[in-house]
Amino acid sequence: MEMVRPAARRSVGETQPPLPSIYSLTLDELKEWLVAQGEKPFRATQIYEWLYQNRVTDFADMTNLPKRLREQLASSFSITTLKTVVKQTSKDGTIKFLFELHDGYSIETVLMRHNYGNSVCVTTQVGCRIGCTFCASTLGGLKRHLEAGEIVAQVVQVQKALDDTNERVSSIVVMGIGEPFDNYDALIKFLRIVNHPKGLNIGARHITVSTSGIIPKIYQFADEGMQINFAISLHAPTNELRTKLMPINKAYPLPKLMEAVRYYIEKTGRRVTFEYGLFGGVNDQLEHAEQLAELIKGLKCHVNLIPVNYVPERNYVRTPRSQIFAFERALKKHGINVTIRREHGHDIDAACGQLRAKERKEETR
């Protein structure tokens, strides 16, 4: 494992809020702003190309724009840059970034390397309020939502790191710190920006959004008409067990969640992925596999079994590999499409929120 730790960090709240991030503007919003300034709408495409194809961080570098417009942009917007506080590189090529925001809060972003390309896992909130009992992200609670531009900036920052080796980000998973549907408007704007051909041009079917199950937003997301991949953090096959693992299940119980999933499938015609973390002696027995098969029977779906990373602050243990394979076989016996997630960054702080939690501990010593 390689670790890089740059200069000292700011204290939370130490700096003044910056100008609005231009990364938060969709192409249409940027066109509207330009027209209001007396500029031609085509300038928006030029600006997008500078931001997302050339990845400049200074409006002065946008040399095909009139000087007056560059000055207007600089006085109206910022180009969000994230300060790298910690960079951990795993033996398998996974890179975990701890980025510092303008107000001193920190977020995690992960670059995962696959045979088919490079995937970036982005964060949508500083902390999380959902309170899943197995997750490091909820330690310390929710501090604030990220703006769309702060989510976009994570992908841009990772892409800039890949530019040195002529690689590109080929897919995005919205599975980092926070509940994406708890920051819904910023999420949707982020998805439209990174998916736009003039933006980062990541294909919709190469983007996955995961939710713990905020039911009203599932219906709303289904109605958006986006071809984004959709995943549910399920982790339990019964209402009682899911409530123990995920307190959100009290507000949005499993039967109602499954109704929303059925609506999503019927509305979009797309498959849903159920993420199922395996916790030793808790939800990993063959009876749980049978219950899970019954729960999702007949649905257009896929199950992703997740060997969980150990989190010191939590009491859960990893399921033995032999038991994971037995669980997989039990599901396949029922005709369930199932895979075991490949583990990334096992030798670094790979669990979501783990690196940030460690840094928070060090700050308070």
UniProtKB/Swiss-Prot annotation:
Enzyme class of the recorded protein, top EC level: transferase
Ligand binding (S-adenosyl-L-methionine): G178, E179, S210, S233, L234, H235, N309
Domain Radical SAM core: 114-347
Enzyme Commission number(s) from the entry: 2.1.1.192
SUPFAM superfamilies, alphabetized: Radical SAM enzymes
Keywords (A to Z) from UniProt: 4Fe-4S, Cytoplasm, Disulfide bond, Iron, Iron-sulfur, Metal-binding, Methyltransferase, rRNA processing, S-adenosyl-L-methionine, Transferase, tRNA processing
Primary localization: cytoplasm
GO molecular function terms listed in the Swiss-Prot or TrEMBL record: 4 iron, 4 sulfur cluster binding; metal ion binding; rRNA (adenine(2503)-C2-)-methyltransferase activity; rRNA binding; tRNA (adenine(37)-C2)-methyltransferase activity; tRNA binding
Cellular component GO terms, alphabetical: cytoplasm
Active-site residues per Swiss-Prot or TrEMBL entry: E108, C352
UniProt subcellular location: Cytoplasm
Cofactor (UniProt): [4Fe-4S] cluster
Family: Belongs to the radical SAM superfamily. RlmN family.
Name this protein carries in UniProt: Probable dual-specificity RNA methyltransferase RlmN
The species this protein was found in: Geobacillus kaustophilus (strain HTA426)
Encoding gene (name): rlmN
